[in-house]
């Protein structure tokens, strides 16, 4: 299985305002797991001040996972993203044709 990571910074339509402050952007990590022409996708988007890991910790955990994809990351957001990519890959493999890599959102 080959795994690719891509980081993005997305602009929110409206500022997200919490007791911790406000933000107009979210940083995300997109994951693509590929094997035999099939692809699965996952995403990690830890929000500062919420959750158990920072964006940097999640990215580091996923970068380590890319080196050893047989062991899921311990960091919760990274683990969920990796598990989602693997599950989507398994679902794609059980379908009749390889995926195009495009996702309807």
Model-predicted regions and their roles:
Residues 1-105:
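N-terminal capping/lid subdomain adjacent to the active-site entrance of alpha/beta enzymes
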């Amino acid at each position: 299985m080959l795994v690719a990571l891509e980081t993005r910074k997305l602009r929110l339509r409206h500022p997200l305002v919490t007791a911790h402050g406000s933000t107009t952007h979210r940083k995300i990590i997109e994951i693509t797991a590929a094997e035999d022409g099939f692809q699965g996708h996952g995403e990690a988007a830890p929000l500062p001040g919420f959750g158990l890991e920072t964006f940097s910790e999640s990215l580091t955990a996923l970068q380590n996972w890319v080196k050893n994809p047989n062991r899921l990351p311990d960091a919760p957001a990274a683990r969920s993203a990796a598990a989602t990519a693997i599950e989507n890959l398994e679902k794609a493999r059980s379908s009749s044709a390889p995926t195009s890599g495009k996702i309807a959102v």
